[in-house]
Amino acid sequence: MISFIKGVLIEKDPTALLIDVNGIGYEVFVPMTTFYTLGDIDSQVSLYTHFVVREDAQQLYGFKSKVDKKVFQELIKVNGIGARTAIAILSGMDSKTLLHCIENKDYALLATVPGIGKKTAERLVVEIYDKLLKMANEIYAQTSGTTTTSQDSQAQQAPTSVVLANSIFNESVDALLALGYKQKDAEKMARSAMGDATTVAEVIRKALQGSIKSKR
């Protein structure tokens, strides 16, 4: 069981990282709330991890905090919620927002996550309600995962060429597709979030936040 990983960040794409640990490269899948907190390539990274073994694959999932890891582990215990859907949930909202959804039984907001319909949202609330409430103090104590990184802050001040903008748009669409959104929806979300955004992380963050706000 791999419960924690610390190493050098070699590659980072939305939802997937490559981390060098003493010469061995580990592919780690992460929610966007963790991706937002990462430093630059070649920087040190430490993640709490959950190892999933299936018949056709062995996959490692990483989280910025032990609390997010626990929430993920509770999510995948829910009937109909797999690891990919759990990652999509924690990409669209942090643990605190998820707790609010569960407390308020906000089925409509939960159903905005790709792969979750109304029935699955209702089942999720029923099955995870008590467990998440027991974790409330831990969830509220942790820092929000949507803090802008220094890299994002610097990027916001840099000019964006048409070529770079197109690259950011295409990468953002690919990331949203990886989270389970349909092509048409992913393009619409990325386009509406572009504005003056100059990084993929910034576009995706705005796109996911915009999707949540539109349902409230």
UniProtKB/Swiss-Prot annotation:
InterPro entries: DNA_helicase_Holl-junc_RuvA_I, Hlx-hairpin-Hlx_DNA-bd_motif, NA-bd_OB-fold, RuvA, RuvA_2-like, RuvA_C, RuvA_C_sf. Pfam families: HHH_5, RuvA_C, RuvA_N. One of its GO terms (molecular function) is four-way junction helicase activity. Homotetramer. Forms an RuvA(8)-RuvB(12)-Holliday junction (HJ) complex. HJ DNA is sandwiched between 2 RuvA tetramers; dsDNA enters through RuvA and exits via RuvB. An RuvB hexamer assembles on each DNA strand where it exits the tetramer. Each RuvB hexamer is contacted by two RuvA subunits (via domain III) on 2 adjacent RuvB subunits; this complex drives branch migration. In the full resolvosome a probable DNA-RuvA(4)-RuvB(12)-RuvC(2) complex forms which resolves the HJ. Has three domains with a flexible linker between the domains II and III and assumes an 'L' shape. Domain III is highly mobile and contacts RuvB. One of its GO terms (cellular component) is cytoplasm. Residues 144-163 are annotated as: Flexible linker. Residues 1-64 are annotated as: Domain I. One of its GO terms (biological process) is DNA recombination. It comes from Francisella tularensis subsp. tularensis (strain SCHU S4 / Schu 4). Belongs to the RuvA family. This is Holliday junction branch migration complex subunit RuvA. The RuvA-RuvB-RuvC complex processes Holliday junction (HJ) DNA during genetic recombination and DNA repair, while the RuvA-RuvB complex plays an important role in the rescue of blocked DNA replication forks via replication fork reversal (RFR). RuvA specifically binds to HJ cruciform DNA, conferring on it an open structure. The RuvB hexamer acts as an ATP-dependent pump, pulling dsDNA into and through the RuvAB complex. HJ branch migration allows RuvC to scan DNA until it finds its consensus sequence, where it cleaves and resolves the cruciform DNA. The gene is ruvA.
